[in-house]
């Protein structure tokens, strides 16, 4: 079957190019682009590969998922999408297998903790399983397209006239959130520049083009200005399993200053950023880049006397966060474990 061979080789090339892009840091892709591309590839794997039952398919998805995740462990969105697809396979198989919705209800925390060791039999063959899974993935892709709009639609509930809002760095989700609020409310945004990458400057330009009164300041001035701020609104790279954040460097400083002044800290993040990871997973948590922006090579005399590290992310503990705003509404950090059980199966937390 030359057609099938061509399709297989084309899919392999697409997966290879995606893996190579991940190894290089993902290029200019946003987390949403990563999620969409991962889902597209997984959908192609499901339709193009040969498999006879849900068990074989899940093993295939796990294998390809591990390969993608190994290319860039800090890009948690890829692993999250793999886990979502595994959950979809389990649900569609359960429906065809005759399991009732009542028995598939999300279990209590106690049951989730004590359910280890029980594994389901996925060896039965169902002809319509593939079409059902693909349809569910298509629905998930449609949901992904509307995540930013759904978060932005909640802006007027949280931002009021004449407020002073502080944010840090560049977040497309926060930008859309503030732009939506600015259509009906007048407020002032202070953007911390997020050195050494200084993405806050781009954020400030984008907001000022939208007619929002914007001020850029250095990260060192965060604490001094915080007493004037009504709310802190930030984005994040990942929401961890304990309700903490893995966000751009400087976010922890901002969160501590907000806590000291009892200023509410709101995190705008879509559900695909929710990860079953914990902060002690070293490989996937930390990411360091060249410290050239901090200590340029022109400082020749000092270079051999100093070891310089430039981390990309900060860890922000859950007790510093007031509210998460996602595409399904607002939730407290303590509710994250519940959302986790709705999105991912406990057996898929470690692929």
Curated annotation (Swiss-Prot):
Gene: EIF2B2
Any single Pfam family the record assigns to this protein: IF-2B
Molecular function as annotated in GO: ATP binding; GTP binding; guanyl-nucleotide exchange factor activity; translation initiation factor activity
Organism: Oryctolagus cuniculus (Rabbit)
Similarity comment text for this entry: Belongs to the eIF-2B alpha/beta/delta subunits family.
Activity regulation details: Activated by the chemical integrated stress response (ISR) inhibitor ISRIB which stimulates guanine nucleotide exchange factor activity for both phosphorylated and unphosphorylated eIF2.
UniProt subunit comment: Component of the translation initiation factor 2B (eIF2B) complex which is a heterodecamer of two sets of five different subunits: alpha, beta, gamma, delta and epsilon. Subunits alpha, beta and delta comprise a regulatory subcomplex and subunits epsilon and gamma comprise a catalytic subcomplex. Within the complex, the hexameric regulatory complex resides at the center, with the two heterodimeric catalytic subcomplexes bound on opposite sides.
GO CC field: cytoplasm; cytosol; eukaryotic translation initiation factor 2B complex
SUPFAM superfamilies, per database record: NagB/RpiA/CoA transferase-like (SSF100950)
Primary residence: cytoplasm
Protein's cellular compartments: Cytoplasm, Cytosol
Annotated function: Acts as a component of the translation initiation factor 2B (eIF2B) complex, which catalyzes the exchange of GDP for GTP on eukaryotic initiation factor 2 (eIF2) gamma subunit. Its guanine nucleotide exchange factor activity is repressed when bound to eIF2 complex phosphorylated on the alpha subunit, thereby limiting the amount of methionyl-initiator methionine tRNA available to the ribosome and consequently global translation is repressed.
Keyword Zinc-finger assigned: no
Protein name in the entry: Translation initiation factor eIF2B subunit beta
GO process terms (BP): central nervous system development; cytoplasmic translational initiation; myelination; oligodendrocyte development; ovarian follicle development; T cell receptor signaling pathway; translational initiation
Alphabetical keyword list: Cytoplasm, Initiation factor, Protein biosynthesis
């Amino acid at each position: 079957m030359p057609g099938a061979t061509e399709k297989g080789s084309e899919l392999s090339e697409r997966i290879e190019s995606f893996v190579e892009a991940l190894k290089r840091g993902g290029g200019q892709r946003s987390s949403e682009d990563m999620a969409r591309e991962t889902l597209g590839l997984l959908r192609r794997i499901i339709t193009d590969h040969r498999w006879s039952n849900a068990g074989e398919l899940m093993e295939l998805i796990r294998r390809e998922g591990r390969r993608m995740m190994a290319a860039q462990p800090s890009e948690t969105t890829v692993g999250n999408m793999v886990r979502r697809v595994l959950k979809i396979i389990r649900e569609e198989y359960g429906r065809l297998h005759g399991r009732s919705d009542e028995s598939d209800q999300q279990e209590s925390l106690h049951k989730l903790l004590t359910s280890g060791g029980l594994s389901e039999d996925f060896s039965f063959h169902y002809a319509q399983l593939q079409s059902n899974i693909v349809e569910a993935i298509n629905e998930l892709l449609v949901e992904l397209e509307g995540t930013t709009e759904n978060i932005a639609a909640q802006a007027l509930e949280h931002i009021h006239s004449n407020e002073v809002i502080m944010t840090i760095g560049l977040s497309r989700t926060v930008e859309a959130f503030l732009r939506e609020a600015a259509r009906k409310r007048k407020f002032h945004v202070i953007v911390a520049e997020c050195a050494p990458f200084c993405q806050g400057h781009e954020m400030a330009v984008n907001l000022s083009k939208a007619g929002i009164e914007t001020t850029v300041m250095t990260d060192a001035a965060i604490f001094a200005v915080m007493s004037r701020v009504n709310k802190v609104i930030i984005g994040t790279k990942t929401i961890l399993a304990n309700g903490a954040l893995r966000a751009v460097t400087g976010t922890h400083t901002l969160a501590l200053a907000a806590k000291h002044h009892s200023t509410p800290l709101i995190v705008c993040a879509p559900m695909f950023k929710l990860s079953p990871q914990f902060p002690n997973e070293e490989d996937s948590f930390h990411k360091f880049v060249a410290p050239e922006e901090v200590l340029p090579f022109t400082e020749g005399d000092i270079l051999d006397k100093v070891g310089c590290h430039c981390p990309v992310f900060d860890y922000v503990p859950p007790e510093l966060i007031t509210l998460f705003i996602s595409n399904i509404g607002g939730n407290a950090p303590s509710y994250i474990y519940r959302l986790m059980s709705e999105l991912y199966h406990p057996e898929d937390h470690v692929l």
